[in-house]
Amino acid sequence: MFRIVKWLIALPVGIFIFFNAYVYGNIITYRAVAPHRTAFMSMRMKQFEQEGRDVALDYRWVPYNRISTNLKKALIASEDVRFAGHGGFDWDGIQNAIRRNRNSGEVKAGGSTISQQLAKNLFLNESRNYLRKGEEAAITAMMEAVTDKNRIFELYLNSIEWHYGVFGAEAASRYFYKKPAADLTKQQAAKLTALVPAPLYYADHPKSKRLRNKTNIVLRRMGSAELPESDTD
């Protein structure tokens, strides 16, 4: 009996260690190499297949300096205004999320920073529970420890979901505006950013009033967004 208990404890611990060793190795690789595709992309494409949707993956990696500063500022203004200065976690946002989750009785809000969102996109899935949030935090800490802010942001910009099968700034810019991501205007960048929290909902409701309102809010805020110090755009 004792041996069985030992195995029941050792097995999940071993899986946790193995998975995080795998993740860490990939984080080191991604400092210089673009991901072939992310875990979230694979999960989403499998979901579309199961739903009987004929969706092709449109994912086009471009370097950081070929993405409009307008889009960078819009995303920071909307998703993580403290991105340039924090170590991967926005503690005020996390405390607010905990309060909202406690009031609702389930994990709805995550207080996720850009770094945390990237951790989810690269390695995890859409599930909302405290175990997954803990793993997300561990990956975020590893990534922030060995990867500079510009590279984290570059990975994020290239992995965001924007429509059915459309991932990354370049694919989104060409899908919506028939132009490279480097040429996005402020209005276009704000509109793309407004899609980020719920891209598939807005794909089905493109004339949503909420989308228009969010676009206008992003436009007002993006001028004061602070990019990482090493940004040379």
UniProtKB/Swiss-Prot annotation:
Primary residence: membrane
Protein name per the record: Biosynthetic peptidoglycan transglycosylase
Reactions the enzyme catalyzes: [GlcNAc-(1->4)-Mur2Ac(oyl-L-Ala-gamma-D-Glu-L-Lys-D-Ala-D-Ala)](n)-di-trans,octa-cis-undecaprenyl diphosphate + beta-D-GlcNAc-(1->4)-Mur2Ac(oyl-L-Ala-gamma-D-Glu-L-Lys-D-Ala-D-Ala)-di-trans,octa-cis-undecaprenyl diphosphate = [GlcNAc-(1->4)-Mur2Ac(oyl-L-Ala-gamma-D-Glu-L-Lys-D-Ala-D-Ala)](n+1)-di-trans,octa-cis-undecaprenyl diphosphate + di-trans,octa-cis-undecaprenyl diphosphate + H(+)
HAMAP family: PGT_MtgA
Pathway: Cell wall biogenesis; peptidoglycan biosynthesis
Compartment(s) of residence: Cell inner membrane
Family designation: Belongs to the glycosyltransferase 51 family.
Gene Ontology BP term (one): cell wall organization
Sequence intervals crossing the membrane: 8-28
Keywords attached to this entry: Cell inner membrane, Cell membrane, Cell shape, Cell wall biogenesis/degradation, Glycosyltransferase, Membrane, Peptidoglycan synthesis, Transferase, Transmembrane, Transmembrane helix
UniProt xrefs under SUPFAM superfamilies: Lysozyme-like (SSF53955)
Annotated Gene Ontology cellular component terms: peptidoglycan-based cell wall; plasma membrane
Entry membrane topology: Single-pass membrane protein
EC number: 2.4.99.28
Annotated function: Peptidoglycan polymerase that catalyzes glycan chain elongation from lipid-linked precursors.
Species for this entry: Neisseria gonorrhoeae (strain ATCC 700825 / FA 1090)
UniProt key word Cell membrane: yes
Gene3D superfamilies linked to this entry: Biosynthetic peptidoglycan transglycosylase-like (1.10.3810.10)
Gene Ontology terms for molecular function: pentosyltransferase activity; peptidoglycan glycosyltransferase activity
Underlying gene: mtgA
